[in-house]
Amino acid sequence: MAHMVRASSGLSYPERFYAAASYVGLDGSQSSVKQLSSKFSNDTSLLLYTLHQQATLGPCSIPKPSAWNPVEQSKWKSWQGLGTMPSIEAMRLFVKILEEADPGWYPRTSNSVLDPAVHVQINSTKAEPSFESGASFGETKTITSEDGRLTETQDKDVVLEDPDTVSVYNQWTAPRTSGQPPKARYQHGAAVIQDKMYMYGGNHNGRYLGDLHVLDLKNWTWSRVETKVVTGSQETSSPAKLTHCAGHSLIPWDNQLLSIGGHTKDPSESMPVMVFDLHCCSWSILKTYGKPPISRGGQSVTLVGKSLVIFGGQDAKRSLLNDLHILDLDTMTWEEIDAVGSPPTPRSDHAAAVHAERYLLIFGGGSHATCFDDLHVLDLQTMEWSRHTQQGDAPTPRAGHAGVTIGENWYIVGGGDNKSGASKTVVLNMSTLAWSVVTSVQEHVPLASEGLSLVVSSYNGEDIVVAFGGYNGHYNNEVNVLKPSHKSSLKSKIMGASAVPDSFSAVNNATTRDIESEIKVEGKADRIITTLKSEKEEVEASLNKEKIQTLQLKEELAEIDTRNTELYKELQSVRNQLAAEQSRCFKLEVEVAELRQKLQTMETLQKELELLQRQRAVASEQAATMNAKRQSSGGVWGWLAGTPPPKT
């Protein structure tokens, strides 16, 4: 679901946004808001409304509505919460949310908003006779769109053939199939066991599927497998109890099918591993040990020897991942890998392959807004990520593509890049990292879809690549086959040229050109390897220096920690001494205060003493004066009394 928007049409922004807004009925009127609420849930309607406002009017600048109008206040808060989000980002999120809520919206839009480059027109005439696979004679195919209308598409790049006539090299052919084909879908899983392609799950109209179908690659006959679910010792024949999922990985292992991860309606905390027993036709949950990865979908799962290597994906909260996990199929134990180097940025819907049972290659994928065309290599022995220069005709950025390996060649088909489907089928020589184009189709055909499946099998003794399903504006359930001319066996063809069958004569010229190109590439391989070795030695030397510096820094840090501990102890000692001094100072201040109080009392007493002394002096003077007066007055009275004066 994360990248469904890439395959919805050939329209670019802002036309795609206006087409989506026209579909949901947002024209700015109040009736359009009511129409929106009638189509989607309240949360989805509110989010679409606010993103439309942000895309068309910019950041919210209107005053906050009254609390008496909770609906308008809720709209205002949601719009205000978008802040200064750019208009083009709001448009992209608007279309993305619409795709998740209504994946089939694009085919139901009016013809006036469709991209004219798609060449889809209403077929008002009677549909051409068709076979059980849904493909018709000639160059015109009749396809039923999501709204039940019939459309015609011109597909000159896919040749419709009988099963026994798939003999053209490097060109896609559509074999006529029999039996009841599966429902159209994308993001399903497919795997081959004993010349039979098993197809499980997927996404149709936003609904996860849980059915299992098998295509016999010998007679091209479809049949549905009635499955049962085993829970402990209890069995049930009801397939509905099996978890429906999309974006999972289907891996063949020991005559069994392993279904790993995938998006579900009620996701679990950890990534589940389901196993399907071909003999009992039963699903069961595989018991694993260790710490499993968190639940996710859109990841890559690669079988390397007896281990599964899981990278990236998108969790249940739609957060992108770039973590690495390995499941040992012997011990059923999970291990999370902390690889060195620069890993790929978080992504989902990428492709992965293993080369020489040692190197894991990751190509493309997408984030919420960007598709990638980068190629990353993980050395599974040293667990080190690296990036190398790609040679040849490098593919365009894409996500939702599929890939298979034949020998040292990695074939990549489909995917999208936010504008259109990837129409070129490309191949990477994993030894030289050189790209080349195998063939090309028109952008509107099912092979230029997102979420298709790709498997490799053999037919009449030769390798074939089988593609099924996908989504490019409508869901597909077509089967297409490619018989590649292998570059991995060029040397044997050169040495045994006389033994080449006559049936190869039609492609001798193309094979010769491939040989010349391969020789040139091999001539550059030694120089590239020498350069890479030199760069690796330089990186290792630089890494050793960094390790030495790291050790030195660790030692210095340890010394600093020790010194810091000592200083802290000294600080604590000083603090204790300071506390003691502060206590002593406080006591001294109390004593000084008491002495000052006593001194003030002594000064008062001194003043009182001086006052008493002055009063005493005055009293003495007064007494002396009085005595003198008495003496003088006593002489007169004595004379009068006849008393003689005292002798002197």
UniProtKB/Swiss-Prot annotation:
ACB domain residues: 13-107
Pfam families to which the protein is assigned, alphabetical: ACBP, ACBP4_C, Kelch_KLHDC2_KLHL20_DRC7
Major localization listed first in the record, in broad terms: cytoplasm
InterPro entries (UniProt xref): ACBP4-6_C, Acyl-CoA-binding_protein, Acyl-CoA-binding_sf, FERM/acyl-CoA-bd_prot_sf, Kelch-typ_b-propeller, Kelch_1
Compartment(s) where it occurs, according to its Swiss-Prot or TrEMBL record: Cytoplasm
Record-stated family: Belongs to the ACBP family.
Name of the protein in question: Acyl-CoA-binding domain-containing protein 5
